[in-house]
Amino acid sequence: MTDRPIMTTSAGAPIPDNQNSLTAGERGPILMQDYQLIEKLSHQNRERIPERAVHAKGWGAYGTLTITGDISRYTKAKVLQPGAQTPMLARFSTVAGELGAADAERDVRGFALKFYTQEGNWDLVGNNTPVFFVRDPLKFPDFIHTQKRHPRTHLRSATAMWDFWSLSPESLHQVTILMSDRGLPTDVRHINGYGSHTYSFWNDAGERYWVKFHFKTMQGHKHWTNAEAEQVIGRTRESTQEDLFSAIENGEFPKWKVQVQIMPELDADKTPYNPFDLTKVWPHADYPPIDIGVMELNRNPENYFTEVENAAFSPSNIVPGIGFSPDKMLQARIFSYADAHRHRLGTHYESIPVNQPKCLVHHYHRDGQMNVYGGIKTGNPDAYYEPNSFNGPVEQPSAKEPPLCISGNADRYNHRIGNDDYSQPRALFNLFDAAQKQRLFSNIAAAMKGVPGFIVERQLGHFKLIHPEYEAGVRKALKDAHGYDANTIALNEKITAAE
């Protein structure tokens, strides 16, 4: 018989019997002093933590970021210097589904990256799409509510989704991507990733540049049709997890080409679009993507819960040489992501091993739930405030960003006034070939099943402003799929409104 470790309680005491509860007599009731049973049941009651409010269903892996290009003239970030190799963690996800949702659903895929750099953790928290549904964070909770379950029926509501989208024309770009082939990828090895937001670079000379990050899959793109996805879900709800885990276990390491688009700081005032608008892309003809490196995933987690479910990504985690921008959605996420982790994982969530930086950490935060580092991180128990005379940690002036020029009156500006929400979706639509357009029309028609006619007509009006062919194609697909025709509900509502 081989030597095996002794089973103990969480306090370290050996357990004599893990098969039978302590009872008063063979048939008698269980005794309250059976602490082993109480401990076991209590731990089971607390095994589940709150799932993420968004992006709950996810898949993760470790890897390496290798920089092969030279953008040192734009940024001082050590992680982006030529030849740098940085360990990292990636977590992919769906947006709307809960932890038990099927993987093969039509949805945006989250693309969250944590780079363990020598200057601290750098998190890039993006999606597999370069744009998003809303541009003002005040509307983000409302949008997410439409993707979740109806409070009365507890069912997903196509009516809520299309009602919100049809009242929010800024969503057209993302909706078009979502309903296209790329809205239903076969897995996450065959998708692109995007930082989506506009970030900034700054160099040793104090010069600032605006930047967008792209991760282009080197495996090619693969997508399901709706019918194919239904068959996949009938076989397995874990198709993406199975694919990613198996590929890495078999040594088929997925790779992404890393690119950046760089815009001189003053160009932001010259572009015909707002370069900080999350519903817009930067045309590649104006700001060509620059190849800077390769991201490879090459190791599976040993424990999903501790290394993927406990992973906490936040856009607030940046390093010297990388900064933020006036992107309103980014500004809100800087706060909301870290705050969500404090709620879901605890005050000191960054002490969880998967979230710990690889460099030394020194700060004056103290006490609180989950404090496992001895009170303070200053290295001296007498230095628990700042400034102090007891060799506590001090600032590093070289990490200061260059000043950002901001002007304007404080107000709640209508973000739809003077904003063109149709040109970029039109450019995307015109890139589709005939077969891609037909699938787009069919996917939209399928997603509109059961939606009231007046909402359908409102959305069709937006599609027509993108391109008459877009509106006509969806209208025909609706008739073919559901027998939808000239809508009397919409007409009656217009008459009522006029009266």
UniProtKB/Swiss-Prot annotation:
The active site is at H55, N127. Its cofactor is heme. Residues 1-25 are annotated as: Disordered. Keywords: Heme, Hydrogen peroxide, Iron, Metal-binding, Oxidoreductase, Periplasm, Peroxidase. InterPro entries: Catalase, Catalase_3, Catalase_clade1/3, Catalase_core, Catalase_haem_BS, Catalase_immune_responsive, Catalase_sf. GO terms for cellular component: cytoplasm; periplasmic space. Heme binds at Y337. It catalyses: 2 H2O2 = O2 + 2 H2O. PROSITE patterns: CATALASE_1 (PS00437), CATALASE_3 (PS51402). It is found in: Periplasm. Gene3D superfamilies: Catalase core domain (2.40.180.10). Belongs to the catalase family. Decomposes hydrogen peroxide into water and oxygen; serves to protect cells from the toxic effects of hydrogen peroxide. This is Catalase. It comes from Brucella suis biovar 1 (strain 1330).
